[in-house]
Structures are given as structure tokens and as C-alpha cells.
Amino acid sequence: MNIQLSPLEARVIGCLIEKEVTTPDHYPLTLNSLTTACNQKSNREPVLNLSEAEVQDTVEGLIARRLVSDESSFNSRTSKYQHRFCNTEFGDLKLNQQELGLICCLLLRGAQTPGELRTRTNRLCTFTDVKETEAVLERLANRDSGALVVKLPREPGKRESRYHHLFCGEVDMAAFATSSDNEANASSQYAELEQEVAALREEVAELRALIEQHLS
């Protein structure tokens, strides 16, 4: 896979993909609209507070790499931007609607489970069920031309593993595994504390019964 993005570039590309599908009448986006989309509180993780200057710098870098284009007319005072991230005439990256929806949501929110992705992509594409969502994710993870996503170690107490995109570089699997181990240890310690509290309550109840017998 040749496309590598910074976290801010991933946010900009994700927003352009999202708005192309969800608000086609207002696409391509002006700088103001794109900044608002980048700082949106819903369907964003983390929530950012970028200035227009920061977004402009990021967009200019993406334009230089031909991942974004300025579609404003010659006499227009306002620039309007659209992504050239995938499905362009001469580009190598081709994604169907389901694949694009998943990549978009992963760019905007980071690691998520198939169940979360199925719910959060409902305005971008349609999945019959979670199994279909996971099947498409596995296809993206096992592309002959290079994986676009990776399956992360399953978190303690969770039924599903999360998936993460690879457009910002390789994911530190050891860090995720350590995080999962830490959560498992914390859960184990919590269970031990619960058992100790239960035992102490029994002892208190027994002592209270003895005291009541003595007083009576």
C-alpha cells in the first residue's frame, strides 16, 4: 500500500469521503465546511478543534500529493475541495461502496468492532448483518496488493475483535496486546476485591449475630 497519511490528513480525507456520500449537494467542500466537518463532535474520535489555517495546510499537502483537488471555478473566490483518495481514473486504489464506507469510518474514529462499524456506516453503505461486515473487513485485511486494515487482539470481556486502518502506518500490535493484558489484570484484581468484600461482609454478619446473641 503506497498511501501513507498523518492523523490530520486521515481526518481530512475521511471527512471528504463522508460528506461526498452524505451531503452530495454541498460537495465539494469549502475550507469552512471542511473545518467544521473535521471538528464535528459526532462520529469523530478523537474530537478535534482545528483552525482553518491548520486544515488549509493539511489540504495543501494533500493537493501536492494529488490526494485532494481544488474544484473551484477560475473566477471563484472560494476554493472547494474533493478527495482523490480512491476510485479515480488513473489511481490504483479501487474500493466498492462497502469497503469505502468502512475505510471512511475507520479514518474518522480509529479502531472499531464489526458491530460498531455496521451501525456507524449506515449512512455510507449497507450491510446485511455483522458477518457480512466482518467478511468485507477480512477482504480488506487480505488484499493481494497490500492490507488496508488489520485485526487487533480481542479485548478482555469483548465478543468481537476491533479492526484498525493502516493508512497511518503499521499498528503497534504489542501495545494493543499490552493494553488488553492490563485490562485483563485489572478485571482479575477487581474480581479478587469483590470476593474479599463479600468475605468481609459475611464476617461482619457473623459478628453481628454473635453480639446480638450475647446482648439477648
From Swiss-Prot:
Gene3D superfamilies, A to Z: Winged helix-like DNA-binding domain superfamily/Winged helix DNA-binding domain
InterPro entries: DUF480, WH-like_DNA-bd_sf, WH_DNA-bd_sf
Family: Belongs to the UPF0502 family.
Protein name per its UniProtKB record: UPF0502 protein VC_A0740
The species this protein was found in: Vibrio cholerae serotype O1 (strain ATCC 39315 / El Tor Inaba N16961)
